[in-house]
């Protein structure tokens, strides 16, 4: 018979008591009262924070936006088709954040920073909050470096600087996305990281942009954040903040970044949809009262950082769509008041064959010539004035029958200047080529040509100058100034090319 030893048993019990680890885990949970239209009403979750992520039983993630006395309004980051009434929900204790790293370059991701290009997972060890505070006044410095778009009309008359926010506004189908993608293409070799955020676009349009960037080798320094028209409203609302978080990651690492939001009208509509479903009180045009804050907190994150923070920059090009050219609608006026200027694209100009269809008269850059190199300031000074005078004269000339010689000459010059501003899509020009083009037009060298010959002559002149006078490009790129030597070289090239061109045309 086995003897029971009391001391041995008591030792075992004592050891077990000592090893016992009393760990109390408190989980903030709730129950689904109602779900539908991308919104869930939750009972419980008493200690949830505004904007906190919550996790449903079947794995869907949501954001707690409405904290009411008897329930919590949660917007779903997914379709939520498997969520049932009565199922449990738990608070995660986290605010929305995404992984960030250099590995995102060249990839297409969604608003949750998950890859959607079928090229596997993206490795990242660092995380960044989707919504973070914008740099303060002391953290910034004034904008002084140019960000070249490659479009003559913009770089000469509506210059954009690194750290600026410049709105691109116009009706649908006026070339807003084309201006943005051309700007990305022109950053090749400029050491600028680009982030293109597509909000509520057709999947085919996004695919077309990605294909263009891949063909031109621009995806190497670009990240595309895409939430197409069939995505839940929550993800369309979050996409711009995800893009901004990625751009900020590079900005704080002393890099220059360019971010394009295409377009913020769709983000505002997604936010309106969410707000109305959450039964928040609607305001003007049924948008929520804080729709201004929606865009201001996003665009204020663009900045030129001070030298103590490494002088990185984040330049924002938000796009807003207007209805029949009405810039006085709610969202356009909001974004105009937040940004440092706007590029207005006109449907009338687009339809009359002037592309890019930039209305120079009402487009403005509030940074101005501070964002231009000295050489560009020297040649582009009188271009805007001459074009403004031409537009006024042209309107007057429609009613006047007989015009004096000076007026006729001014009209002829204006037509040629307007012609030199035309550019094909995906064909950005270097700053040296732009300076050469503007100088040729404003100094009357094109006056002897027919309007239809202007573009052909300029294309040939660019090739001739590059081949036969490479010193011109070297002087501009090294000194950033339009020196007398550069001017002499350019005059020679124009004269030689003009003689060749006239002989060709006569042949």
Curated annotation (Swiss-Prot):
Biological function: Produces ATP from ADP in the presence of a proton gradient across the membrane. The alpha chain is a regulatory subunit.
Pfam families according to UniProt: ATP-synt_ab (PF00006), ATP-synt_ab_C (PF00306), ATP-synt_ab_N (PF02874)
Keywords: ATP synthesis, ATP-binding, CF(1), Chloroplast, Hydrogen ion transport, Ion transport, Membrane, Nucleotide-binding, Plastid, Thylakoid, Translocase, Transport
InterPro entries tied to this protein: ATP_synth_asu-like_sf, ATP_synth_asu_C, ATP_synth_asu_C_sf, ATP_synth_F1_a_nt-bd_dom, ATP_synth_F1_asu, ATPase_a/bsu_AS, ATPase_F1/V1/A1_a/bsu_N, ATPase_F1/V1/A1_a/bsu_N_sf
Cell compartment(s), UniProt: Plastid, Chloroplast thylakoid membrane
Broadest EC class assigned to this enzyme: translocase
Record-given protein name: ATP synthase subunit alpha, chloroplastic
Location, primary (coarse class): plastid
Family affiliation: Belongs to the ATPase alpha/beta chains family.
Membrane-topology descriptor: Peripheral membrane protein
Domain of life: Eukaryota
Organism, scientific name: Nicotiana tabacum (Common tobacco)
GO molecular function terms listed in the Swiss-Prot or TrEMBL record: ATP binding; proton-transporting ATP synthase activity, rotational mechanism
GO cellular component: chloroplast thylakoid membrane; proton-transporting ATP synthase complex
Amino-acid positions noted as binding ATP in the UniProt annotation, renumbered to this chain: 170-177
Subunit-level organization: F-type ATPases have 2 components, CF(1) - the catalytic core - and CF(0) - the membrane proton channel. CF(1) has five subunits: alpha(3), beta(3), gamma(1), delta(1), epsilon(1). CF(0) has four main subunits: a, b, b' and c.
Keyword Protein transport attached: no
PROSITE patterns listed in its UniProt record: ATPASE_ALPHA_BETA (PS00152)
Catalytic reactions on record: ATP + H2O + 4 H(+)(in) = ADP + phosphate + 5 H(+)(out)
HAMAP family: ATP_synth_alpha_bact
Annotated site (Required for activity): 363
């Amino acid at each position: 018979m086995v003897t029971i030893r009391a001391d041995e048993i008591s030792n075992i019990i004592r050891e077990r008591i000592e090893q016992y680890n009393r760990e109390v885990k408190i989980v903030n949970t709730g129950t689904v009262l109602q779900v539908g239209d991308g919104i869930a009403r939750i009972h419980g979750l008493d200690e949830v924070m505004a904007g906190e992520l919550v996790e449903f039983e079947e794995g869907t993630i949501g954001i707690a936006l409405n904290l009411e006395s008897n329930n919590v309004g949660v917007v779903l980051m997914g379709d939520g088709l498997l969520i049932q009434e009565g199922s449990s929900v738990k608070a995660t204790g986290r605010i929305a954040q995404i992984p960030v790293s250099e590995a995102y370059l060249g990839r297409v991701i969604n608003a949750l920073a998950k890859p959607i290009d079928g090229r596997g997972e993206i490795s990242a060890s660092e995380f960044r909050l989707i919504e973070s505070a914008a740099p303060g006044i002391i953290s910034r410095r004034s904008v002084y470096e140019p960000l070249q778009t490659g479009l003559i009309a913009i770089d000469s008359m509506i210059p954009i600087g690194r750290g600026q926010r410049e709105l691109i506004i116009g009706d649908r189908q006026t070339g807003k996305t084309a201006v943005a993608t051309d700007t990305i293409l022109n950053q090749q070799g400029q050491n600028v990281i680009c982030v293109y955020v597509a909000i509520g676009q057709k999947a085919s349009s996004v695919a077309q942009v990605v294909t263009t960037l891949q063909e031109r080798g621009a995806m190497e320094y670009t990240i595309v954040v895409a939430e197409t028209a069939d995505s839940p409203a929550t993800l369309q609302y979050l996409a711009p903040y995800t893009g901004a978080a990625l751009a900020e990651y590079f900005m704080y690492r002393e890099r220059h970044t360019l971010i394009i939001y295409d377009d913020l009208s769709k983000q505002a509509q997604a936010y309106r949809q969410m707000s109305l479903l959450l039964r928040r009180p609607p305001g003007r045009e049924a948008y929520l009262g804080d729709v201004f804050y929606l865009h201001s907190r996003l665009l204020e994150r663009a900045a030129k950082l001070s030298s103590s923070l490494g002088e990185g920059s984040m330049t924002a090009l938000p796009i807003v769509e207007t209805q029949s050219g009405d810039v006085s609608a709610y969202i356009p006026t909001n974004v105009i008041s937040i940004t440092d200027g706007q590029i207005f694209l006109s449907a009338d100009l687009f339809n009359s064959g002037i592309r890019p269809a930039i209305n120079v008269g009402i487009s403005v850059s509030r940074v101005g010539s501070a964002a231009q190199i000295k050489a560009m300031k020297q040649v582009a000074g009188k271009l805007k004035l001459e074009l403004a005078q031409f537009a006024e004269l042209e309107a007057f000339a429609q009613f006047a029958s007989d015009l004096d010689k000076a007026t006729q000459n001014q009209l002829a010059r204006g037509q040629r200047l307007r012609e030199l501003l035309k550019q094909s899509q995906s064909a950005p020009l270097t700053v040296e080529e732009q300076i050469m083009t503007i100088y040729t037009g404003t100094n009357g060298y094109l006056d002897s040509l027919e309007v239809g010959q202007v573009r052909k002559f300029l294309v040939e002149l660019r090739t001739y100058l590059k081949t036969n006078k490479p010193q011109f490009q070297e002087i501009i790129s090294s000194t950033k100034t339009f020196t007398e030597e550069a001017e002499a070289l350019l005059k020679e090239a124009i004269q030689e090319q003009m003689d060749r061109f006239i002989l060709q045309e006569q042949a």
